Amino acid sequence: MTTLNPYFGEFGGMYVPQILMPALKQLEEAFVSAQLDPEFQAEFQDLLKNYAGRPTALTLCQNLTKGTKTKLYLKREDLLHGGAHKTNQVLGQALLAKRMGKTEIIAETGAGQHGVASALACALLGLKCRIYMGAKDIERQSPNVFRMRLMGAEVIPVHSGSSTLKDACNEALRDWSGSYETAHYMLGTAAGPHPYPTIVREFQRMIGEETKAQMLAREGRLPDAVLACIGGGSNAIGMFADFIDEPGVGLIGVEPAGLGIETGQHGAPLKHGKVGIYFGMKSPMMQTSDGQIEESYSISAGLDFPSVGPQHAYLNSIGRADYVSVTDDEALDAFKALSCNEGIIPALESSHALAHALKMIKAEPEKEQILVVNLSGRGDKDIFTVHDILKARGEI
């Protein structure tokens, strides 16, 4: 029996080998007690404020919306220590690991941002850290790989399958199956077996809480919509959580359409996948007609994931959130537009959410509306990827 509900409607659950059930139960119990422990909460809040740099800014775009009646705000998770929203929840999970008496952290990473966040939290709190990363992603994200190693983490290349995030997830779970007595698996997104989707949401929900308070202070009202990119879905659920019960606020999640949905080269399982069991949960995923997990694709390593967190699947099923998709090229255009017009270089992941916001503004330039894009990370890690693409096109 679990203390918390392991499902969001029909989605979620704990589809793991029996050997891992005690570890998940221990984690749930530690999380529930920590949420009620003022000392734990005070330590977590202190780290968020004085180490990570919260609250993060809410920035009004001065130039991107000229000639329209839209106010476009960016929630600046790119300013967080570590460069992305990932730092929020790893600090919480690292404190939980210490509370459970664990001495080691296992993590997986795609774009490398969760790996960097895990490495910095472990360095700070004195935990050993080993990080599984697809060999293809190691090539795409060499600056982040060096950052992880610089902070003392062991980075383990994964060559199986497509050598990307899903394969790193599989290897990390395999490792944890044999080491859970001393190691905590620091899952990087709001997916996987219960209680991870709930833990990650709660350790990210300050994004939306701060946004709500900042909007009321700046505008005297809530935004018309908040937008966030969707890979596994942690930055989005962190933004959405505090707005779910605000019916006047639209929730828009943006999946990667890659080379185009019609090509099959995408990472948009919410709208174009089928429900199945993968990575310890029941959720929509990209799969073949005979049920094999299909390879996802995105220009952005952090969105290159064939499934999605179960709470997003639920919000989609009840119509509370809208999920759309944006192609590589549209994300690249948004990446360039924000860099050129506002002096902010966004992560390619975040550029997907920005691209859809810009499409909304272009479609109705006379509409008076306030939009907030969760700028989930900074684009330093992506400049080499973007440089190579633009050079190949003759644009630079």
Curated annotation (Swiss-Prot):
One GO CC term on file: cytoplasm
Cofactor (UniProt): pyridoxal 5'-phosphate
InterPro entries: Trp_synth_b_CS, Trp_synth_beta, Trp_synth_beta/beta-like, TrpB-like_PALP, TrpB-like_PALP_sf
Pathway entry: Amino-acid biosynthesis; L-tryptophan biosynthesis; L-tryptophan from chorismate: step 5/5
E.C. number: 4.2.1.20
SUPFAM superfamilies assigned to the protein according to its UniProt record, in alphabetical order: Tryptophan synthase beta subunit-like PLP-dependent enzymes
Gene3D superfamilies hit by this protein: 3.40.50.1100
A GO molecular-function descriptor: tryptophan synthase activity
Family matches, as PROSITE patterns: TRP_SYNTHASE_BETA (PS00168)
Keywords of this entry: Amino-acid biosynthesis, Aromatic amino acid biosynthesis, Lyase, Pyridoxal phosphate, Tryptophan biosynthesis
Similarity comment: family membership: Belongs to the TrpB family.
General function of this protein: The beta subunit is responsible for the synthesis of L-tryptophan from indole and L-serine.
Name used for this protein in its record: Tryptophan synthase beta chain
UniProt organism field: Yersinia enterocolitica serotype O:8 / biotype 1B (strain NCTC 13174 / 8081)
